[in-house]
């Protein structure tokens, strides 16, 4: 929004305000909270004989809300401190786990890569226009995953204090590469080489859980649950900063922190809506 209002001039300020209004409503923790709860139910509670329920999800939601409140009410410094400590270690742990799965199914790696290419550019897909739809869906998922081109990441990177802005720019460029090209690609490959995509009706996080359980029976699902918890939680606290900056731009930095109250409340509301 500052690039629009300062770089393009005040006459474009309505566009900057529209961006902030959209960001205010889009920067919500509902998806991440649901994924954390879904992973907990799939990995911990259902194997123990406890089915998912509204009351159980609300209890987990309250715990998540409390942890989120502790972090986001501490400001950008506390958010950055948590993210800097947790994310690199979790990325490394996740990549090591996926690497072990790929080594176990090493003979299926090349056939899986060939399958990806063949299905993407098959004659039937081209004639049916499916390639365009797949590319569009991939672009949407990539933008949701790494925020490339959306305009939100500059809020976080712009808040850093560094003597070398170029280095911060390089860090910003590495984000999409690590997130989408490395983590997401290896996750998809992990699902393919284990074969769970053929034998299971699950999707999303549940399908990834089955891939980990199949190859790493004792630790796989718990490693994945821990990684999902950390990734989801750090994303939740990061999104809160975006929403706060958007509200601050509209009504002033003095009142922007009120966004935090709405943000932590929407976690419980979102978990309640999925049971309606």
Give the positions of each predicted feature.
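Membrane-interface alpha-helices at helix entry/exit sites of multi-pass transporters
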Residues: 6, 10-18, 51-52, 162-177, ...
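Extracellular/periplasmic helix-exit of transmembrane alpha-helices
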Residues: 97-115, 158-162, 174, 178-205
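Conserved small/polar residues in nucleotide/adenosyl-binding loops
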Residues: 275-276
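Helix-loop-helix hairpins and the membrane-proximal interhelical loops
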Residues: 78-139
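Transmembrane-helix boundary/entry motifs in multi-pass membrane transporters
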Residues: 1-26, 208-224, 248-255
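Helix-loop-helix module between adjacent transmembrane segments
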Residues: 5-34, 38-71, 226-236, 269
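Helix-loop junctions at the membrane interface of multi-pass solute transporters
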Residues: 71, 142-147, 151-165, 172-176
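C-terminal membrane-solvent junction of multi-pass transporters and transport-like membrane proteins
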Residues: 8-12, 225-228, 232-270
């Amino acid at each position: 929004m500052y690039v629009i209002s300062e770089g393009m001039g005040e006459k474009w300020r309505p566009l900057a305000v529209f961006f902030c209004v959209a960001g205010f409503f889009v920067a919500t923790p509902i998806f991440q909270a649901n994924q954390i709860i879904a992973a907990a139910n799939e990995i911990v509670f259902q194997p123990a004989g406890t089915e998912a329920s509204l009351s159980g999800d609300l209890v987990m939601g309250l715990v998540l809300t409390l942890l989120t409140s502790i972090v986001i009410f501490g400001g950008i410094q506390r958010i950055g401190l948590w993210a800097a400590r947790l994310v690199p270690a979790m990325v490394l742990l996740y990549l090591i786990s996926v690497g072990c799965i790929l080594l176990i199914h090493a003979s299926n790696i090349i056939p899986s890569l060939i399958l990806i290419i063949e299905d993407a550019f098959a004659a039937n897909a081209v004639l049916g226009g499916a390639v365009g739809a797949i590319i569009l869906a991939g672009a949407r998922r990539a933008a949701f995953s790494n925020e490339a081109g959306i305009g939100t990441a500059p809020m976080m990177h712009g808040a850093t204090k560094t003597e070398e802005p170029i280095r911060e720019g390089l860090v910003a460029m590495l984000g999409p590469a690590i997130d989408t090209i490395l983590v997401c690609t290896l996750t998809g490959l992990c699902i393919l080489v284990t074969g769970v995509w053929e034998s299971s009706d699950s999707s999303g996080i549940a399908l990834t859980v089955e891939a980990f359980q199949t190859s790493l029976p004792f630790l796989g699902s718990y490693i994945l649950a821990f990684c999902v918890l950390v990734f989801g939680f750090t994303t939740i606290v990061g999104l809160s900063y975006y929403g706060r900056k958007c509200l601050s731009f509209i009504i002033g930095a003095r009142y922007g922190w009120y966004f935090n109250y709405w943000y932590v409340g929407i976690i419980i509301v979102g978990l309640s809506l999925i049971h309606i």
